[in-house]
A protein has these predicted regions:
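Beta->alpha turn/N-cap motifs
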Residues: 33-38, 72-77, 86-98, 121, ...
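A ligand-binding cleft/hinge motif common to bilobed small-molecule-binding domains
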Residues: 94-102, 149-151, 180-212
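Short helix-initiation/N-cap motifs at beta->coil->alpha
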Residues: 70-81, 163-177, 181
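Ligand-binding cleft/hinge of the Venus flytrap
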Residues: 58-67, 144-168, 199
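Extracytoplasmic small-molecule ligand-binding "clamshell" domains
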Residues: 2-92
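Acidic, polar ligand-binding/catalytic clefts
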Residues: 63, 68-130
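Extended ligand-binding regions for polar small-molecule ligands
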Residues: 1-14, 55-63, 129-135, 140-143, ...
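Periplasmic-binding protein-like
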Residues: 111-119, 195, 199-236, 254-268
Length: 268
């Protein structure tokens, strides 16, 4: 299966593994709820296996803890209840860290996400006012159409520039195709999705800076001893040895890389 990490090169770290709850150590696996509908974070290959950069990162973190991974495919809305019910140890699904989530969960933050635009390589977007008056594609019902682009409109008007012309699409693939065909000037999505589309375009598209950044990562249940710290330490060691950067680069999401892995780093 497609992967950006060589697990055979990762040595288990006994000092970190000692922090794991006894039930996980005895089981020998991390049970992970995953919603594989969000390329490049987690999605399915032709054989139905979960792949993506968060899958690679969790496989590597598990190897660092001397564990294997057991992915259970689930709907996004069902993952957190299953973590709280201890059916899953953690979840993957592009989770943003928020104060609300921290009430019942510990969020292991290993990424910075936000809103990001892609445009033709010869017309890069350097700052947000660059999109005033442009035709911009976004996904129907997504945060870009509902929140981000209306806020940009206000900034455009305040600066005496024309509003953004927003065109809604049902899927990410449709808006990427429209941009490549010249029907759009730019498209907007979550930064990992935009970064991956840019990577797949083989130089035709270029990404903007990330706007409205938030910390993102994996939720685990509170009160599971040192589990959150074990996971944080495992990913931190992957950051130190270059594995983390290698995975992010492979999947085109390096713009969201962070310098320190934290637990519950969000302040709002």
């Amino acid at each position: 299966r497609q992967t950006g990490v060589d697990l055979s090169k990762i040595k288990a770290d006994d000092a970190i593994a000692k922090m794991l709850p006894a039930d996980i150590t005895e089981r020998g696996t991390l049970i992970i709820g995953v919603d594989p509908t969000y390329a490049p974070n987690e999605f399915k290959d032709a054989q139905g296996n979960p792949i993506g950069w968060e899958i690679d990162l969790m496989d590597a973190a598990a190897a660092k803890l001397g564990l294997k991974t057991d992915y259970r495919v689930a709907k996004f809305d069902n993952i957190v209840p299953s973590i709280l019910g201890e059916k899953y140890d953690l979840g993957l699904g592009g989770y943003y860290d928020t104060k609300k989530r921290q009430e019942t969960l510990d969020m292991i933050d290993f990424f910075q996400a936000g809103e990001q635009l892609a445009s033709p390589a010869d017309k890069p977007i350097k700052e947000i006012l660059d999109i005033c008056g442009l035709k911009v594609g976004a996904q129907n019902g997504g945060s870009a159409i509902l929140n981000f682009l209306p806020k940009v409109d206000e900034q455009c008007v305040a600066a005496g520039k024309p509003k953004v012309e927003v065109l809604g699409y049902e899927t990410q693939d449709e808006q990427t195709s429209a941009l490549l065909l010249g029907r759009l000037d730019a498209m907007e999505s979550d930064s990992p999705v935009t970064g991956y589309a840019v990577k797949l375009s083989e130089g035709k598209l270029v990404g903007s800076p990330i706007f409205d950044t938030v910390l993102a990562g994996a939720p685990v249940k509170k009160d599971r001893g040192e589990f959150a710290e074990a996971l944080r330490s495992a990913i931190e060691s992957l950051l130190e040895d270059g594995t983390y950067d290698g995975i992010l680069n492979y999947w085109g999401v390096e713009v969201g890389g962070i310098q320190q892995i934290t637990v519950n780093g969000a302040t709002e």
